[in-house]
Amino acid sequence: MRKARLLATAFMLVVSLPAQSVSWRGNVTVQERLFFQDPADPRQHGNNFSVAAQPEMYHEWADGQQSVSFIPFARLDQGDDERSHADIRELSWSYVAREYEWTVGISKVYWGVTESQHLVDIINQTDLVEDIDQEEKLGQPMAKLSLIRDWGTVDLFVLPGFRERTFAGVKGRPRVIPRVEKDLARYESSQEGRHVDLAARWSHAIGDMDIGLSWFHGTSRTPILNPAQYNGEIVLAPFYQIIDQAGIDVQLTRGSWLWKLEAINLDGNYVKYKRATGGFEYTFYGIANSAADLGLVMEYLYDSRGELATTPFEDDFLTGLRLTLNDEQSTDALLGVIKDTHDDSYLVSLEANRRIGDSWKLSIQASKFLADGLDQSLKSFAEDDFLQVELGYYF
């Protein structure tokens, strides 16, 4: 109810703006997920259909110095009540001056350069019910001040209002086993979700290199999942600890080579670790005398916890191919394989996109999981190989 009232209030504020000064765009998508095996938990559904909408409103004045943006999102899912959800991705006011910028409200901030995972991207919470690749994020309340100088840009954040990570429900698929029970969520801070987090980032372009140094203090976006009893069932209970995280991201462009690195040091009272992802992408331009480009992607994924890591990517290699046709339909595809160095566990993923006409877009995603080792985090998805087909209308 609270979220519905907030969405309604935001909508009323937006429609009160002069119609001629507001620009609208957005998309409506239909999505089908096809699973190739019976679920590991008989309560989980099989193939699944859903519909989603994400309109976007933008209004600026004072010669573009001030602006307001509003991006709500909603999905109606056939099988998982937790995936049927709504969120305000963005509802913010921005003020742009010569040497500084303000953003106040609900917004999204992206940090990161690597392909396989984004370790430094900590401002927004992951909307995990949308996709297990952790690319989709929830809107985060914030006040952001950007100081623009010759020696770089400094972004300062005050982050009130913590967002809990979304997880698939009892019928949801793919999901971990045992499932996560959000009603059992606990916090290290006595303020729980009201703890005010702080963050800062310095970024700069130095020749062919883009570099970012970041710091975060507050409630971890990644919960510790502890076994617990819930209505006679073994589940996982999320625990959100207070952390300090320092991070670095670097991208170096040299001709056809693109070198990338992300690394973090996370310090908490309950869990401490170091993680890093680094590698390169080499692009073959105009393959076979065509307009198409083919990129070779290789990355190494490291976690100091080793086999004790709660992520499947603690000592793994990513090998991938990125095909970009550079045609009128903006056709592209990315095939990737993440392989564990200690056993035969791996994850294969495929993403492909193609525009149809001026307003339609077809997207295909496929994932295959193989867990022959001791990695329980990947074994949870062993029966959840799937093909996802999505058709979107963009206006």
Where are the model-predicted features located?
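Transmembrane beta-strand segments that form the barrel wall of outer-membrane beta-barrel proteins
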Residues: V30-D38, S67-Q78, R89, T126, ...
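Outer membrane beta-barrel
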Residues: Y58, G64-P174, G207, A371
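Outer-membrane beta-barrel "beta-signal"
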Residues: L145, F280, F381-F395
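Residue-level signature of outer-membrane beta-barrel architecture
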Residues: V22, M57-W61, S94-A97, I106, ...
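Residues that define the transmembrane beta-barrel architecture of outer-membrane proteins
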Residues: H45-V51, S84-R89, K137-P141, I148, ...
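Detector for outer-membrane/organellar transmembrane beta-barrel domains
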Residues: R254-D340
